[in-house]
């Protein structure tokens, strides 16, 4: 990305002005104002042009925005929807995308289109577009396939997703850890630990290293399978190996403890990490309190919320209302306790 930016900086003002003059002189149903535009403005212009069927302008805008340092986003092809115009719009895009400047500009436009097609549930069309990329000798990368694998594994179409992997390999595109994580998360969400272990084996066989999301999925899987102790062991391994622990990983453990009825351990768990990361504290204490309230464990929830107040942690609207309605009237009693008595009080309440 930095190399691209340095390249753009080297472009002379005259060169950029020349591109803008060309854009203004070309026929278009969409008026393109001169000057540097924001990413959202480019997306708006592209969607206006696409909706009006002016795909020559779509092509020019896709070219010009990259030259001007404005990259495509998930909103770039928002005009492409599951309506009567879908087929004709897609064919027009397939026609103009090969005409975009080669290299990053064209590759990025294709990748964004594939992502849009997957969001619309058009997996077959996304694979057709990948075929276009391959025929056009564009460098296919694992990230090109990520939206497809994500979409299929979320819908638990695992066999279909593995067929896509076979197609990747036939085009000499290797799997990266992110691609494997989609399979891992799908299996772990359903508590399928054996299948998850098989995916982990494949990750290592391919020479990849599990990342934070890989371990996050494993913790989720252990909790969904009712093996909270195993989940906590995985979390400890992450810490020992220096792998960044995501906030969601803590949330998985808290969920497993609360759903297993281990309310005291839930508080003990969040207290063990308290004071190291203010945002983590807010997330973990708030998440635990919310879970307890939903399970109507009001007494335990009051203890957690009091802890949040004492630590000055951010509190959501629902917890704030819960606190104001149930907890603040007991503040005087809590304030009268010294630290040792307070810890004893919490232990007695939770056991």
From Swiss-Prot:
<feature type="repeat" description="PPR 4">
    <location>
        <begin position="211"/>
        <end position="245"/>
    </location>
</feature>
<feature type="repeat" description="PPR 1">
    <location>
        <begin position="106"/>
        <end position="140"/>
    </location>
</feature>
<feature type="repeat" description="PPR 5">
    <location>
        <begin position="246"/>
        <end position="280"/>
    </location>
</feature>
<protein>
    <recommendedName>
        <fullName>Pentatricopeptide repeat-containing protein At2g40240, mitochondrial</fullName>
    </recommendedName>
</protein>
<dbReference type="GO" id="GO:0005739">
    <property type="term" value="C:mitochondrion"/>
</dbReference>
<dbReference type="Pfam" id="PF01535">
    <property type="entry name" value="PPR"/>
</dbReference>
<keyword id="KW-0809">Transit peptide</keyword>
<keyword id="KW-0677">Repeat</keyword>
<dbReference type="Pfam" id="PF12854">
    <property type="entry name" value="PPR_1"/>
</dbReference>
<keyword id="KW-0496">Mitochondrion</keyword>
<feature type="repeat" description="PPR 3">
    <location>
        <begin position="176"/>
        <end position="210"/>
    </location>
</feature>
<feature type="transit peptide" description="Mitochondrion">
    <location>
        <begin position="1"/>
        <end position="27"/>
    </location>
</feature>
<dbReference type="InterPro" id="IPR011990">
    <property type="entry name" value="TPR-like_helical_dom_sf"/>
</dbReference>
<feature type="repeat" description="PPR 2">
    <location>
        <begin position="141"/>
        <end position="175"/>
    </location>
</feature>
<feature type="repeat" description="PPR 6">
    <location>
        <begin position="281"/>
        <end position="315"/>
    </location>
</feature>
<dbReference type="InterPro" id="IPR002885">
    <property type="entry name" value="Pentatricopeptide_rpt"/>
</dbReference>
<comment type="similarity">
    <text>Belongs to the PPR family. P subfamily.</text>
</comment>
